[in-house]
């Protein structure tokens, strides 16, 4: 069942969802912007006795981490050794990074960039607690600077952000997940030309190696019980 709720305040939205608990066997939160989605999920999980799933976060993270595990096997690398550069500090991006940490990636090896550049200690522009958890203590500020020797690029941001020159700075057998839709951070042919040994995935079904929460969503519990904020 798809239920639309006309409420933009995260606390009020969460309380409405919690009040609906007797109606559903599980809840899938949909299209709630960051950072509000983190608060809504936290409140719902603390108060409800049924599963609470946010596919923008958890669906994407599960598929990304499964794909990353396979990519690392191909590249002969390990989670605890790799440097990851990620673009996009929204719900999907943060959830992916949190799950990658649980799989063994060291936080000190994760470099998060958003529209304002690198997330670093002391930055005040467009920050929240979820981004701050990945803030780096460094003088570097740009994607172009931090991409050097990266083992993996994780893009959940926008089109044409990753350039050929950046890819050439990455490590051997770079893993490039350019997952922005409909236009990825770099097109696969451009990435391949810049690094012939690259392991490349996008969020699109018309390119090889699709990494998208659609690969998981309809196998998750109670896919009919969806709640969206509008």
How would you describe each model-predicted region?
Residues 62-147:
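Glycine-rich phosphate/diphosphate-binding loop of Rossmann-like nucleotide-binding domains
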Residues 180-207, 211:
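Rossmann-fold NAD(P)-binding glycine/threonine-rich loop
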Residues 56-70, 205-220:
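Short alpha-helices
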Residues 218-230:
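Single conserved hydrophobic/aromatic residue that forms the stacking wall/gate
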Residues 119-179, 185:
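Rossmann-like NAD(P)-binding element
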Residues 37, 60-65, 91-98, 161-165, ...:
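Short glycine/serine/threonine-rich phosphate/pyrophosphate-binding segments
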Residues 1-80:
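Glycine/serine-rich phosphate-binding loop and adjoining beta1-alpha1 elements at the start
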């Amino acid at each position: 069942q798809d239920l639309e709720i006309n409420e933009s305040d995260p606390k009020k939205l969460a309380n409405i969802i919690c009040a609906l608990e007797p109606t559903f066997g599980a809840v899938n939160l949909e299209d709630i912007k960051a950072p509000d989605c983190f608060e809504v999920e936290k409140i719902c999980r603390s108060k409800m006795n049924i599963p609470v799933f946010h596919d923008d976060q958890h669906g994407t993270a599960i598929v990304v981490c499964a794909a990353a595990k396979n990519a690392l096997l191909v590249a002969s690398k390990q989670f605890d050794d790799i440097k990851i550069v990620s673009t996009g500090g929204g719900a999907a991006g943060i959830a992916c990074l949190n799950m990658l940490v649980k799989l063994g990636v060291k936080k000190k090896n994760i470099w998060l960039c958003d529209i304002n550049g690198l997330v670093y200690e002391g930055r005040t522009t467009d920050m929240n607690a979820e981004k701050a958890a990945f803030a780096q203590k460094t003088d570097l500020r740009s994607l172009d600077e931090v991409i050097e020797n990266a083992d993996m690029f994780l893009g959940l941001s926008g089109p044409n952000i990753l350039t050929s020159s950046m890819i050439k700075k990455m490590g051997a057998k770079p893993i490039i997940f350019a997952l922005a839709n409909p236009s990825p951070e770099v097109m696969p042919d451009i990435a391949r030309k810049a690094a012939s040994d690259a392991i490349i995935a996008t969020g699109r079904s018309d390119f090889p190696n699709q990494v998208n929460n659609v690969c998981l969503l309809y196998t998750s519990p109670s896919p009919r019980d969806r709640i969206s904020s509008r």
